[in-house]
Regions:
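Extended terminal
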Residues: 91-123
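Short, solvent-exposed linear patches
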Residues: 8, 82-84
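Short polybasic amphipathic segments
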Residues: 13-17, 54-58, 86-90, 108-115
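Extracytosolic secretory-pathway proteins
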Residues: 79-82, 89-94
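Short helix-loop boundary/capping segments
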Residues: 1-77
Length: 123
């Protein structure tokens, strides 16, 4: 349990994938998944909610890569099927920063991506 009494899981990934072209993609991620609701109703997974925080780094053998940082916890409602809030900054190497914003809590498939001050809405 964390300091707030919530169950949490540390998730670490360190892997490499080889594409059919022979190029490799390396991925390293360190995340914390905090169970914010539904932990006492083990037979009803649809009332579960999680906050996810952390970082990720991806690199390509042909050059380039990216880093990702959760700047506001990504909130998942299992019964919804989509992230409902949270912000991630994705910094591709030699490219502008991308800010992904999942909104303010509404269960919908809408999110925005901001690049160079331009915001694009996806749903």
């Amino acid at each position: 349990l964390n300091a707030s009494g919530q169950p949490y899981f540390n998730v670490q990934i360190d892997g490499v994938a080889t594409l059919s072209s022979g190029e490799t993609v390396s991925y390293t991620s360190t995340r914390v998944r905090t169970w914010t609701a539904g932990s006492t109703t083990l037979l009803n997974r649809f009332d579960d909610e999680y906050d996810i925080t952390g970082t990720a780094i991806g690199t390509f053998s042909s050059g380039g890569g990216y880093t990702a940082l959760t700047t506001n916890p990504v909130h998942i409602k299992v019964g919804c099927g989509f992230p409902v809030s949270g912000t991630i900054e994705i910094a591709p190497q030699s490219r502008p920063l991308r800010i992904v914003d999942y909104g303010s809590g509404t269960c919908d498939a809408t999110f925005t991506v901001t690049v160079n001050g331009q915001t694009y809405t996806f749903n």
